Amino acid sequence: MSRQPILDIEGLRTVFRTRAREIVAVNDVDIVVNPGETVALVGESGSGKSVTSLSIMRLLARKVGFIDAGSIILRGKSGQTVDLAAIDEEAMRRIRGNDIGMVFQEPMTSLNPVYTIGDQIGEPLRVHRGTSRREALEAAVELLDRVGIPDARRRAGQYPHELSGGMRQRATIAMALICNPTFLIADEPTTALDVTIQAQILDLMQKLQSESGMGMLFVTHNLGVVAEIAQRVVVMYAGRIVESGPVKEVFRNPRHPYTMGLLRSMPRLGDATEMKRRGEKLNTIPGMVPGLANLPSGCAFAPRCSFAVEACHAAVPPLASVNEHHGSRCIRWQEIAA
């Protein structure tokens, strides 16, 4: 399998324009995704995860959000590369849904309530390949069966409200994969599902990825999911990457206080009962994610950080190399141990 990246983002900077000023939502982001690899993008709400994925898809609100700098190099099915940050909307439409698929967090908002499931799943084939409606429907039925929806032909004729939450999410996965994309963005695809269905969806996505060899960017705040599905992890805070590296290494040896805080905040089996017995509380990260319009000077995490020193407030730290594959945006990373 080729190890040329499917996706190579360098220096991505995304800006939102308000009446008063321009606000930087994503700043100096670098992400590489290889064929067959899953990279998890994690952080609290407001960290810039979803804006990063919407920037890749070029789905930012028109006249409000725009890519101000950087490149997003995609290697499509033809093997040719294209900079998604530089092409016009017409060219992007030919790529979106064809070379790149996206699974959204809430299927009821990404499925049209007035069209049948089969019509919606088959639409990318009609748009990108000129497939007839009948052929597109047959392909949709086949894919619904592959993603584990029983009685697929009948379900293809139903509307979104007639399916359970788990079935709707399977349908959105089918819609994202119908054109066999080389790259998939999964933006919090299991958040709205119960734990049992969540596990089934994760297993399904891993199976489909294994069969196709596509690269995947998995956006989530759930570190338990990251440990299960991803090979590498990118941690974002206030629009910047603060740590990145192989999942096992970052989880075992985090070198940024924010990553440490996220890991320590994860509830584990048996924790609640034992902590209640001892009169203890679950670990939390003090404070709140700052608003992007009012970021503190220096390191944005410094006001919440127990490791912060005066120098942390003076300038934004560079992303330092812990080793060849592991980076941390902390001037004290060498002193930090979980």
UniProtKB/Swiss-Prot annotation:
GO terms for cellular component: plasma membrane. GO terms for biological process: peptide transport; protein transport. GO terms for molecular function: ATP binding; ATP hydrolysis activity. It comes from the Bacteria. The keyword Protein transport applies. It is a peripheral membrane protein. InterPro entries: AAA+_ATPase, ABC_Ni/Peptide_Import, ABC_transporter-like_ATP-bd, ABC_transporter-like_CS, Oligopep_ABC_C, P-loop_NTPase. ATP binds at G43, E44, S45, G46, S47, G48, K49, S50. It is found in: Cell inner membrane. SMART domains: AAA. Its EC number is 7.4.2.-. Its main location: membrane. PROSITE patterns: ABC_TRANSPORTER_1, ABC_TRANSPORTER_2. Keywords: ATP-binding, Cell inner membrane, Cell membrane, Membrane, Nucleotide-binding, Peptide transport, Protein transport, Translocase, Transport. Pfam families: ABC_tran, oligo_HPY. The keyword Glycoprotein does not apply. PANTHER family: ATPASE AAA-TYPE CORE DOMAIN-CONTAINING PROTEIN, OLIGOPEPTIDE TRANSPORT ATP-BINDING PROTEIN APPD. The complex is composed of two ATP-binding proteins (BAB2_0817 and BAB2_0818), two transmembrane proteins (BAB2_0815) and a solute-binding protein (BAB2_0812). Belongs to the ABC transporter superfamily. Probably part of an ABC transporter complex that could be involved in peptide import. Probably responsible for energy coupling to the transport system. This is Putative peptide import ATP-binding protein BAB2_0817.
